[in-house]
Protein backbone atom coordinates (compact mmCIF):
# COMPACT_ATOMS: atom_id res chain seq x y z
CA UNK A 1 0.00 0.00 0.00
CA UNK A 2 2.90 2.32 0.59
CA UNK A 3 3.77 1.84 -3.07
CA UNK A 4 0.35 3.20 -4.09
CA UNK A 5 0.68 6.16 -1.73
CA UNK A 6 4.02 7.04 -3.34
CA UNK A 7 2.55 6.63 -6.83
CA UNK A 8 -0.32 9.01 -5.97
CA UNK A 9 2.20 11.47 -4.54
CA UNK A 10 4.42 11.43 -7.64
CA UNK A 11 1.44 11.79 -9.99
CA UNK A 12 0.15 14.74 -7.96
CA UNK A 13 3.55 16.42 -8.10
CA UNK A 14 3.76 15.99 -11.88
CA UNK A 15 0.19 17.22 -12.36
CA UNK A 16 0.93 20.15 -10.06
CA UNK A 17 3.99 21.16 -12.07
CA UNK A 18 1.97 21.12 -15.27
CA UNK A 19 -1.08 22.80 -13.74
CA UNK A 20 0.52 25.53 -11.71
CA UNK A 21 2.97 26.58 -14.42
CA UNK A 22 0.15 27.37 -16.82
CA UNK A 23 0.41 24.33 -19.08
CA UNK A 24 -3.00 23.02 -18.07
CA UNK A 25 -5.50 24.35 -15.57
CA UNK A 26 -7.22 20.96 -15.35
CA UNK A 27 -3.99 19.36 -14.15
CA UNK A 28 -3.99 21.72 -11.16
CA UNK A 29 -7.36 20.36 -10.06
CA UNK A 30 -6.15 16.79 -10.48
CA UNK A 31 -3.03 17.62 -8.47
CA UNK A 32 -5.08 18.99 -5.59
CA UNK A 33 -7.31 15.93 -5.49
CA UNK A 34 -4.39 13.49 -5.66
CA UNK A 35 -2.47 15.46 -3.04
CA UNK A 36 -5.33 15.22 -0.57
CA UNK A 37 -5.77 11.51 -1.33
CA UNK A 38 -2.06 11.00 -0.62
CA UNK A 39 -2.34 12.93 2.66
CA UNK A 40 -5.36 10.87 3.76
CA UNK A 41 -3.58 7.61 2.91
CA UNK A 42 -0.53 8.79 4.86
CA UNK A 43 -2.62 9.66 7.91
CA UNK A 44 -4.45 6.32 7.81
CA UNK A 45 -1.16 4.41 7.64
CA UNK A 46 0.30 6.54 10.42
CA UNK A 47 -2.63 5.78 12.73
CA UNK A 48 -2.48 2.07 11.84
CA UNK A 49 1.25 1.97 12.55
CA UNK A 50 0.80 3.67 15.91
CA UNK A 51 -2.01 1.29 16.87
CA UNK A 52 -0.04 -1.77 15.76
CA UNK A 53 3.05 -0.58 17.62
CA UNK A 54 1.17 -0.22 20.89
CA UNK A 55 -0.51 -3.62 20.43
CA UNK A 56 2.84 -5.38 20.04
CA UNK A 57 4.39 -3.85 23.17
Swiss-Prot record:
It is a multi-pass membrane protein. Keywords: Cell membrane, Membrane, Transmembrane, Transmembrane helix. The chain crosses the membrane at residues 4-24, 33-53. GO terms for cellular component: plasma membrane. It is found in: Cell membrane. It comes from the Bacteria. The keyword Transmembrane applies. Coiled coil: none annotated. Its main location: membrane. InterPro entries: DUF1328 (IPR009760). The keyword Transmembrane helix applies. It holds the Pfam family DUF1328. NCBIfam families: PRK13682.1-1 (NF010226), PRK13682.2-5 (NF010234). HAMAP family: UPF0391 (MF_01361). Belongs to the UPF0391 family. This is UPF0391 membrane protein Atu4467.
Amino acid sequence: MLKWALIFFVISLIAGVFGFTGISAAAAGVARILFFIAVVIFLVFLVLALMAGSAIV
